[in-house]
Amino acid sequence: SKYDEVKHVDLLKEGKYPTFFEDDLCVVVCPSFGGRLPYTCAERLRHLRANNAIVILVCVYGNRHYEDTLLEMKDICDVCGFTCIGAICAIAQHSIIHEFGENRPDAQDKKELLAFMEQIYLKGDREIEFVPGEYPYKPLKNFPLHPYADKHCTKCGVCVEECPVGAISLEDMKDCDSDICISCMRCIAICPSKARKNNPALVLSTKALIKK
């Protein structure tokens, strides 16, 4: 197969953006935040140059709804020069309210994802024109959840290094810059001391908002 060589490109941090070519097959994976692409994902996707490379889109959402995310991904990838041959919405545990999509993806999810990929493979390189979503896209919503560090923080700096938008500084690792933070919860997920958390009252209000 001409796709035997696999290369992982991490766009979590700004940096060098790859250029793709017609013989490449790309799988672009993005999260859905409140039914939209996080603005940082949209900005970084726009830097890609595809030159008619084939793309399969994967939108990961926390078992609420992905709404306009997949359409937004496709619109951006079309402008970048990708040829979209497939699109998948995959459920994962919600990054804020863990009881939504808890333990997902599970074995059945993985089985279905493999089946979807096989369908796309058998379909061949025929471009798809339609994916779910509406334009204009729904407004972007900012959740007022900005993680902070408790007394267990060891100041190891992992959160500073791994924050995709640079919202945590070495000078003050306890808090984050609420003007920059996108509430992705990466710092909570990767903290080796489990020292980062959200305001519990705000988590409860966010849960109620998501349930509506």
Predicted feature residues:
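FMN-binding flavodoxin-like domain, especially the glycine-rich phosphate-binding loop
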Residues: 1-12, 17-30, 34-142, 201-206
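A mid-sequence, solvent-exposed acidic-amphipathic segment
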Residues: 127-164
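Iron-sulfur cluster-binding cysteine motifs and their immediate structural context
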Residues: 149, 154, 158-182, 186-203
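Active-site-proximal loop/hinge segments that shape catalytic or ion-binding/gating pockets
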Residues: 209-211
